[in-house]
Swiss-Prot record:
This is Endoplasmic reticulum chaperone BiP. It catalyses: ATP + H2O = ADP + phosphate + H(+). Residues 644-654 have a biased composition (Acidic residues). It comes from Ictidomys tridecemlineatus. The keyword Hydrolase applies. It is found in: Endoplasmic reticulum lumen; Melanosome; Cytoplasm; Cell surface. The modification N6-acetyllysine is found at K125, K213, K271, K326, K353. The modification Phosphothreonine is found at T518, T643, T648. Its EC number is 3.6.4.10. InterPro entries: ATPase_NBD, BIP_NBD, Heat_shock_70_CS, HSP70_C_sf, HSP70_peptide-bd_sf, Hsp_70_fam.
Amino acid sequence: MKLSLVAAVLLLLCAARAEEEDKKEDVGTVVGIDLGTTYSCVGVFKNGRVEIIANDQGNRITPSYVAFTPEGERLIGDAAKNQLTSNPENTVFDAKRLIGRTWNDPSVQQDIKFLPFKVVEKKTKPYIQVDIGGGQTKTFAPEEISAMVLTKMKETAEAYLGKKVTHAVVTVPAYFNDAQRQATKDAGTIAGLNVMRIINEPTAAAIAYGLDKREGEKNILVFDLGGGTFDVSLLTIDNGVFEVVATNGDTHLGGEDFDQRVMEHFIKLYKKKTGKDVRKDNRAVQKLRREVEKAKRALSSQHQARIEIESFYEGEDFSETLTRAKFEELNMDLFRSTMKPVQKVLEDSDLKKSDIDEIVLVGGSTRIPKIQQLVKEFFNGKEPSRGINPDEAVAYGAAVQAGVLSGDQDTGDLVLLDVCPLTLGIETVGGVMTKLIPRNTVVPTKKSQISSTASDNQPTVTIKVYEGERPLTKDNHLLGTFDLTGIPPAPRGVPQIEVTFEIDVNGILRVTAEDKGTGNKNKITITNDQNRLTPEEIERMVNDAEKFAEEDKRLKERIDTRNELESYAYSLKNQIGDKEKLGGKLSSEDKETMEKAVEEKIEWLESHQDADIEDFKAKKKELEEIVQPIISKLYGSAGPPPTGEEDTSERDEL
């Protein structure tokens, strides 16, 4: 494997060098852009090192916001975000949550409930409708909004370099599907940029990390939790060669979701205290959004933050305190959910926790102390690397890759190998999924297979292209269909039809079928015309495949879940009975409540050894819901102590 990988890398290098020699004069300086959900960042490889470029406000990260003022002026970046509260209906953000998705996508429908601007359906896609001044309304595709942000990043780089920029490397979440990648490339084109590469954000972060650590083989886990997306990737770095071994994540989890939970909490609280529903006033909601985000940032370094808003709603002021403990309680399920993709990535790459050499935290949300604690505990106390600014790491890596494409000699022999997230194949007789490219195969890649006709004198074969992990195509996702016609009459099994799958560096799939006898060919390119899978569907398919492949895995999971509940209950019981721990700190009323809840669960366990996984989880959740408020109240702003939950709930067997 290693020899073939190195050989492939050398070939890639030679080809890339030769190709880039031809292009070098055309491309000029290639920039690296991290096009984020909430913030974007641009970097360039110059004089042997990466420069992250500050914008006209002196900030190294720029809000991914676009606004249209009543006077007809368009604002991008800081200026747009700064007037959000006074002009919420015409200030557009979160375009990355909509890009490459269809109108009916459940996540789009969920999102538009919370966005202050109008999202409408057009050509089965979500479009953004704003007032552009002078009483005129206009609709924009998400790609156009992203293009405006990319234009801002392009201008930022041009001001710094003193020359035109025409080529870029742009990053996307590893779990972005084909339609989302294609739409991101389109946004670049609209912005006047030739997007030479779309690379995965965690991969870019690992490049940033790996530049100065090239000796020997290392397993790197990149945990990337940003404003709107979450990605986990496992990479191996071997003497400058990067290979993405596995990826997982959620394109719909990030800092904004944490903000949303806090906002909903305060909106309910305000309604309870005053009887008034703030949701009716878009401006008040956006004021709250801005202040909640500030408070969240403050809680990364302090234990409580005040939220003060003058003339918040109907002339009344708003004044509340948010403690770190409350912030964590409101988001605990979301925080914990970040561990599942970490576990999945380890399983997919056949590695144990102890095999991970470095953990890299990327994205502003990894500054949250609880997230850092959960990651550290999951890896049995291993400290994550802190050498990279989490906001800039992705742009840094993109700039290094841009340096490689510019033909910059100082990047050395850096090579980047990405993977496809799902198995790709064709349907053969009986509805069988014949796999050509297994999931987690390094891309770019090309695989061919010879098939034949199923009946005598068959003049046409239909090639159906699928992605998914199940053995039958009916359970997988159809990407596209095409026919190869004009096959000369022959007995079944005689014609030789060569089917070739080719995935390029941007993860875009081309399928070709050729009749070897006549040289007759046909092909299909799977781009965003066909709606590719959502990450939820990808996850469901992978889970389904595993579930149907081995029922005993389900049994093991049931046992693990039962053990989790049992360990949690007994750990609490021991702590309640220990005067040095919880026992000495609880009021008699709280102690009685907790003891009763714990005993109930222990008794239930004894009589329900064969209950379902869901039952065990539900019982654990019930217990958590009783225990956590008591612990939070007890420890107030200092945050809860370890209640045994942290020790047990992530105790995965590998």
